[in-house]
A protein has these predicted regions:
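Nucleotide/pyrophosphate-binding catalytic subdomain
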Residues: 1-169
Length: 169
């Protein structure tokens, strides 16, 4: 019985090693919803991300900040709405949304530092306004226009974990 358990564990480790070899130096993008930060599982998620990084994969983290943005906008008594799952963002809300996005990114960076990983929060995303679509004015809500590929590659090649706040410039 014990031999069977040991064999299953050894087979599982061999399978993992095959994947590590196959994906070594590949880039993996991980989205972390900000609700995980308050979860008891947050630390283990961070440890798993660090393990992926240590296995030779290049990790990019893209945290969501919906919960934190909602908290801050509510505390400041700011109105907002959604259309087709996209927050309609007024110009007045942008500083608060930036604050929320960087708060979430900073918490993730701090957790990674606690695991001896160096992360960098950056503005590698150029965005543009969505404009008016089907009669809906998305105001300051935008979409990705361009990524600064060379800068991102430099950060990854130097062994850092880039964190992309959910806001573009």
């Amino acid at each position: 019985m014990e031999q069977t358990i040991i064999k299953k564990k050894a087979d599982r480790i061999r399978d993992v090693i095959k994947y590590i070899r196959r994906f070594k130096n590949a880039t993996v993008i991980i989205h972390l919803d900000d609700s995980i930060i308050d979860s008891p599982l947050f630390k283990s998620h961070i440890q798993d991300i660090c393990l992926i990084h240590e296995a030779g994969l290049k990790v990019i983290i893209v945290p969501g900040a919906k919960k934190r943005i909602d908290e801050i906008l509510t505390s400041e008594k700011m109105d907002w709405s959604y259309h087709n799952g996209i927050r309609i963002t007024s110009q007045d809300a942008i500083p608060l949304i930036k604050m929320a996005a960087f708060d979430v990114s900073n918490k993730i960076m701090t957790a990674l530092a606690g695991e001896n990983k160096t992360a960098v929060i950056g503005n590698w995303v150029r965005a543009r306004s969505k404009g008016v679509i089907d009669g809906i004015d998305y105001q300051s809500s935008g979409e990705i226009d361009k990524l600064q590929d060379d800068s991102i590659r430099t950060v990854l090649d130097n062994g850092f974990i880039p964190i992309f706040p959910c806001i573009g410039w």
